[in-house]
């Protein structure tokens, strides 16, 4: 199987929006970390601060419903998750 060194994916955060309002952004960041760890069999997942800020850009209780991320391999079972920025 081909190694996933640089991978782009869309993570759906609608399940987070159905929960209670307080602490939604924190739960959303934990959910992103859990999804990436599950898909890539990672021991450590590093979240870019720009991604965390874009998830909660409308406040801590109003998270976005979907987020497009780029997952890059940094080391042995260590992955960096960044916000995917479209280039025109």
From Swiss-Prot:
Pfam assignment, any one: Ribosomal_L31e
Gene Ontology cellular component terms for the protein in this record: ribonucleoprotein complex; ribosome
UniProt keyword annotations, A-Z: Ribonucleoprotein, Ribosomal protein
InterPro entries, per database record: Ribosomal_eL31, Ribosomal_eL31_dom_sf
GO BP annotation list: translation
SUPFAM superfamilies recorded: Ribosomal protein L31e
GO molecular function, one term: structural constituent of ribosome
UniProt family annotation: Belongs to the eukaryotic ribosomal protein eL31 family.
Name the UniProt record assigns to this protein: Large ribosomal subunit protein eL31
Organism: Saccharolobus islandicus (strain L.S.2.15 / Lassen #1)
Gene: rpl31e
């Amino acid at each position: 199987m081909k190694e996933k060194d640089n991978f782009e994916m869309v993570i759906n955060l609608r399940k987070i929006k159905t929960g209670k309002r307080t602490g939604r952004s924190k739960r959303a960041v934990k959910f992103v970390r859990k999804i990436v760890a599950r898909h890539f069999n990672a021991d450590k997942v590093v979240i870019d601060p720009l991604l965390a800020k874009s998830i909660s850009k409308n406040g801590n209780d109003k998270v976005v419903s979907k987020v497009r991320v780029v997952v890059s391999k940094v080391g042995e079972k260590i992955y960096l998750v960044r916000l995917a920025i479209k280039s025109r």
